């Protein structure tokens, strides 16, 4: 069983903001797998299958900085090893629209990832980093929470579709296949 999480903040106020790129990816993934989210614990959860593999889709509803409070208990309950937990999230250090898939690593400056790493007590889990390309001269908090323009929404929609397909490929064929196909694609 895999757990695929997408990070974001709950509520309409945050819906079309860069910080909710992970939620956008999970919505695209749920659509592709014909799965429906329902409230479970501290998150919105959907069950699906990718090939013969059962997959738990998770959108934490704890707000970004406490994402681990949702993901870690679900992983423990379902006995999912960290290597089978993939997290989709916004990354300010990548150009907008670019994906980078990694097997493990630090959280960098991302507080949601810091929370997950702390609660899982490991950095050893795959992540699908979604480029939001934070520009110079704007406070990071202001940038990640700004409403996306129509042009940005189109880029994010395509990036979310690609992240969803990367997650499917990761489960079906493994991390290396997903990295090879999606880690260098930009929009």
Give, region by region, the residue ranges found by the protein language model.
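Nucleotide and nucleotide-moiety/phosphate-recognizing core
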Residues: 2-104, 113-128, 136-139, 146, ...
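Gly/charged, well-structured mid-domain segments that form the phosphate/adenylate-handling core
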Residues: 132
């Amino acid at each position: 069983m895999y757990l695929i999480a997408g990070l974001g903040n709950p509520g309409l106020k945050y819906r079309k903001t860069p910080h909710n790129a992970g939620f956008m990816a999970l919505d695209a993934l749920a659509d592709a797998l014909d799965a429906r989210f329902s409230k479970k614990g501290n998150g919105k959860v959907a069950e699906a299958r990718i090939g013969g593999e059962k997959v738990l889709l998770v959108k934490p509803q704890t707000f970004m900085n406490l994402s681990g409070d949702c993901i870690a208990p679900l992983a423990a309950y379902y006995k999912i090893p960290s290597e089978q937990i993939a997290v989709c999230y916004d990354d300010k250090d990548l150009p907008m629209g670019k994906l980078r898939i990694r097997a493990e690593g630090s959280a960098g400056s991302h507080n949601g990832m810091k929370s997950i790493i702390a609660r899982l007590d490991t950095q050893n889990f795959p992540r699908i980093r979604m480029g939001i390309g934070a520009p110079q001269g704007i406070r990071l908090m202001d940038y990640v929470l700004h409403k996306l323009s129509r042009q940005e929404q189109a880029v994010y929609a395509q990036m979310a579709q690609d992240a969803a397909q990367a997650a499917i490929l990761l489960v079906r064929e493994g991390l290396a296949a997903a990295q090879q196909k999606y880690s260098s694609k930009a929009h």
